[in-house]
């Protein structure tokens, strides 16, 4: 039968109340608070007491214990520091799906509830025993004591004396408590690595007492005066107890395993008399000793274990309270100056009811109203007043916010873009983090970002319209401006390549591909002299012309594809084979063959012609059949000769006396123009407003010397060693319609070139060897120019030029972008901007038809019939600076992928062709439309 009573406050059993009435004014109240791990949140196990089996712990619940024959009553406070209650509280918070789980808020709420119950214990108990499950003191308890002292001095002292005046708790007086309660510490476990001897346990208790005393004294938890102290510590009595010998909360599973282990071993038995003979076999006396009696133990250690219990530890302090010397040794003052009261059970119960209602129950009622402003402030702001960390973090974040905003504003220029704004905001964030920390840091950073954004948008924001090179406009957004400006300057050369100039970052296609070159042509003394190829452009017939809407009105129809002559694609592979028997011809001074100087009138009689490289969409069927027939017939003559295996066959037809006119007409739109560049699937009826390409003859072939390369006075900006063109030997075999015409053409060619010994072409019978010089020029935004000798190699000088070097260039995909060797950074990309061609003096014309693949588009010159290049001349084809499809601007890559250099775009191979010169053709005014202009072949 149990020797104690237990009940849940305030339901006191009648028999217990009768026994407590007999104590009169000699009842000591002991409060038990702290931590627990068992399911019933029992902290009374050290005193040999436990709640009923059906007991369920709850936050704010008080379980009372009374042992018969004693003068003390135990109040077991169940708080959020008990593990079962804390676990239930966490589950309730996690089950709230409307609000995300906030650990900081949860911890503050848990601590504030514990502090509220501790305040009740401090005002209703004489002795408080704090139970700790671990073997060490928790330093965070000092913070709890600080909060308790703050709450008592700032809140409770303001309203408790007044509100207790007309209640049963009026006997508590002005201090509103029984006394300065004596705090004791009970540790349920002793360190496992220490010996559990009397000396070790006592030494560990004394050491812990010294540490606790220093911490509480340092933080003024107790002082020399009882009224100003939150708790009291006895100086001459032990106030720390370690349970070193009793297992309070055993693990029954481990006990069962231990019992199983013991049954598996046979206990040792005493030696019998017959075993003495075995002992005589020992080599010396004492070699084998019998076991002593198993019941012998140290009497002193046994007595220490019986006396070293939590009950004996507590009774010393209870006797001090009963004998009236409770404050002796606790404070350096006279005992009668301290406040200590022993009440009867009914008097104490009235005080307990009143304080519980004021401190705990009224706080749970949200509708409770009171006229006492101090008490109302306590009920409303109690939790916020305890959250000192929240105030501390808020103060730090406020300091960091001021520092971050100051850093942002001090570094902000008059006008800046989003990139600068993000950079300044990142610097402001670093400045904020020097001071601001804690849970409100994210909200403070968001507030700082909003303030900085408002400061930026208040007249300091840039226009930030992206240029065609993805550079933002730096002009103020709020100030009207007709022309955008990014502040980025590029160095580019003119159409002829002689003059370099500074160009602003373009914001539209016209600025990029036309306006700059027209402007720099006015200051270039060569551009004004040359005659350029006139690309077909849009000519409006109305004033309200507009750009074509491709998605709605002009889908990519099959009629928009460029048609080729019948049979051309079939013979293309056979016609583009390289000649293995190219004649090696070394020229020392090619300029001696042509003495014509470049003059302002040079180029007025340029042989700019159009060859039938591709047939018009509306060409007559007869012209196509005639063209295809001439190409099919040419390989049939001479196929038995082994020497002509790799030769290009060019069939010479009889000169036509009258140019035939195409039977079908072709009309272009005069009300809608092509907004981008011409590509392979764009509508033939749409023309651009301006040409994005440029084709110009900059002089005779003699201005280029292969010994010296391109000179600086002629082509400026080339890197050293990268200013050479690549020689290209092409072997042709002429096939005439009949012998009469063959003899006629032979005599005509002899008359055209009398007495010419050094020429870049040789004719031996029906074979013709010509030499062409080709250069693929790349130019970076810093104005550096260089030639390429392979798709993945920059020309480094004459040593890089071999016999088949040019074949690698003209018969391979050439990347549109390539890293400039002037810088190691990948962001300096050079772009394929010009193609240099030096034509031979042979009676043939070189034809150019470039095709540039960028993204899903394949851009072309926009002419149905590609241009012819005149003989013995230096031609330069300038490519677009920016490419645009059907209302889709294609920006250059930020950096080049080494594994895929063609990702940014590339020039297709097979852009060159050769055709027989036709003297009867009118070449002065080439147009987009025309008839077939003689026999041609791709090279």
Swiss-Prot record:
Annotated family:
Belongs to the SMG8 family.
Q: Where is the composition biased (Acidic residues)?
A: 567-587
Q: What does the record list as GO biological process?
A: nuclear-transcribed mRNA catabolic process, nonsense-mediated decay
What are the entry keywords? Nonsense-mediated mRNA decay
Summary of the function given for this chain in its UniProt record: Involved in nonsense-mediated decay (NMD) of mRNAs containing premature stop codons. Probable component of kinase complex containing nonC and recruited to stalled ribosomes.
The molecule here is called Nonsense-mediated mRNA decay factor SMG8
- Organism this protein belongs to: Drosophila ananassae (Fruit fly)
Renumbered to this chain, region (Disordered) spans 561-600, 617-645
| Superkingdom assignment | Eukaryota
Spans of biased composition, class Low complexity?
A: 617-629
Q: Which cysteine residues pair off into disulfide bonds?
A: none
Coiled-coil-forming residues are none
């Amino acid at each position: 039968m149990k020797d104690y009573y237990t009940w849940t406050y305030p339901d006191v059993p009648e028999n217990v109340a009768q026994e407590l009435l007999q104590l009169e004014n000699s009842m000591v109240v002991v409060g038990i608070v702290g931590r627990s791990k068992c399911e019933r949140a029992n902290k009374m196990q050290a005193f040999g007491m436990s709640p009923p089996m059906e007991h369920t712990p709850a936050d704010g619940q008080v379980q009372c214990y009374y042992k018969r024959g004693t003068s003390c009553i135990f109040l077991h406070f169940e708080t959020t520091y008990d593990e079962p209650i804390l676990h239930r509280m966490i589950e309730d918070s996690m089950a709230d799906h409307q609000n995300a789980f906030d650990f900081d808020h949860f911890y503050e709420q848990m601590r504030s509830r514990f502090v509220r119950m501790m305040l009740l214990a401090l005002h209703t108990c004489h002795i408080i025993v704090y139970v700790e499950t671990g073997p060490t003191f928790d330093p965070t308890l000092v913070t709890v004591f600080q909060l308790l002292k703050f709450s008592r001095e700032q809140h409770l002292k303001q309203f408790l004396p007044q509100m207790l005046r007309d209640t049963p708790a009026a006997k508590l007086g002005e201090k509103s408590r029984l006394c300065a309660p004596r705090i004791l510490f009970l540790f349920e476990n002793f360190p496992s690595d220490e010996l559990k001897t009397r000396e070790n346990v006592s030494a560990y208790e004394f050491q812990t007492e010294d540490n606790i005393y220093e911490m509480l004294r340092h933080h003024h938890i107790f002082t020399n005066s009882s009224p100003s102290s939150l708790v009291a510590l006895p100086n001459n009595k032990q106030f720390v107890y370690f349970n070193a010998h009793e297992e309070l909360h055993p693990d029954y599973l481990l006990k069962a395993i231990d019992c199983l282990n013991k049954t598996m071993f046979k206990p040792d038995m005493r030696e019998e008399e017959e075993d003495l003979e075995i002992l005589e076999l020992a080599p010396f006396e004492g070699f084998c000793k019998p076991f002593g009696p198993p019941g012998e133990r140290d009497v002193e250690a046994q007595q220490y274990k019986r006396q070293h219990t939590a009950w004996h530890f507590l009774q010393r302090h209870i006797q001090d309270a009963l004998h009236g010397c409770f404050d002796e040794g606790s404070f350096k003052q006279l005992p009668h100056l301290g406040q200590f009261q022993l009440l009867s059970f009914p008097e104490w119960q009235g005080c307990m009811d009143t304080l519980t209602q004021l401190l705990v129950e009224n706080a749970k009622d949200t509708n409770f109203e009171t006229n006492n402003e101090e008490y109302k402030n306590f009920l409303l702001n109690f939790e916020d007043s305890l959250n000192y960390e929240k105030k501390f973090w808020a103060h730090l974040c406020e300091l960091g916010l001021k520092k971050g905003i100051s850093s942002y504003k001090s570094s902000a220029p008059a006008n800046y873009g989003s990139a600068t704004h993000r950079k300044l905001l990142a610097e402001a964030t670093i400045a904020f983090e020097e001071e601001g920390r804690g849970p409100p840091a994210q909200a403070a950073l968001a507030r700082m970002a909003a303030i900085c954004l408002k400061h930026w948008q208040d007249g300091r924001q840039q226009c930030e319209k992206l240029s065609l090179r993805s550079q933002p406009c730096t002009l103020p957004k709020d100030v009207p401006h007709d022309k955008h400006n990014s502040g980025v300057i590029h160095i580019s050369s003119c159409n002829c390549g002689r003059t370099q100039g500074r160009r602003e970052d373009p914001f539209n296609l016209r600025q990029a591909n036309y306006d700059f070159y027209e402007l720099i042509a006015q200051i270039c003394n060569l551009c004004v002299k040359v005659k350029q190829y006139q690309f077909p452009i849009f000519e409006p017939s109305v004033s309200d012309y507009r750009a074509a809407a491709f998605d709605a009105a002009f889908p990519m129809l099959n009629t928009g594809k460029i048609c080729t002559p019948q049979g051309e694609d079939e013979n293309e592979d056979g016609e583009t084979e390289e000649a293995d028997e190219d004649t090696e011809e070394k020229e020392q001074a090619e300029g001696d063959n042509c003495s014509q100087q470049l003059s302002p009138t040079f180029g007025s009689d340029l042989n700019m012609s159009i060859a039938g490289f591709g047939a018009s969409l509306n060409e007559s069927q007869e012209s196509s059949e005639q063209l295809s027939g001439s190409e099919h017939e040419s390989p049939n003559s001479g196929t038995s000769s082994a020497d002509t295996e790799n030769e290009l066959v060019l069939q010479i037809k009889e000169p036509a006396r009258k140019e035939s006119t195409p039977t079908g007409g072709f009309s272009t739109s005069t009300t809608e123009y092509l907004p981008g560049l011409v590509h392979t699937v764009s509508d033939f009826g749409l023309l651009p407003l301006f040409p994005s390409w440029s084709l110009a003859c900059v002089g005779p072939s003699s201005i280029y010397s292969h010994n010296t390369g391109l000179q600086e006075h002629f082509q400026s900006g080339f890197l050293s060693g990268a200013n050479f063109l690549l020689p290209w030997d092409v072997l042709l075999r002429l096939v005439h319609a009949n012998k009469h015409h063959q003899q006629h053409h032979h005599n005509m060619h002899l008359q055209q070139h009398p007495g010419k010994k050094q020429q870049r072409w040789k004719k031996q019978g029906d074979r013709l060897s010509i030499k062409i010089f080709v250069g693929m020029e790349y130019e970076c935004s810093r104005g550096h120019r260089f030639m390429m000798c392979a798709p993945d190699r920059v020309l480094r000088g004459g040593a890089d030029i071999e016999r088949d070097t040019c074949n690698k260039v003209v018969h391979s995909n050439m990347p549109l972008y390539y890293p400039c060797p002037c810088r190691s950074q990948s962001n300096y990309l050079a772009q394929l901007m010009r193609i240099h061609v030096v034509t031979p003096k042979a009676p043939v014309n070189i034809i150019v038809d470039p095709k540039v693949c960028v993204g899903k588009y394949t851009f072309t010159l926009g002419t149905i019939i590609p241009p012819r290049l005149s003989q013995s001349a230096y031609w330069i084809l300038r490519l677009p600076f920016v490419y645009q499809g059907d209302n889709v601007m294609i920006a250059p890559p930020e950096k080049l992928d080494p594994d895929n250099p063609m990702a940014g775009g590339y020039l297709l191979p097979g852009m060159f062709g050769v055709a027989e010169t036709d003297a009867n053709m009118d070449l002065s005014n080439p147009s987009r439309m025309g008839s077939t202009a003689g026999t041609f072949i791709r090279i």
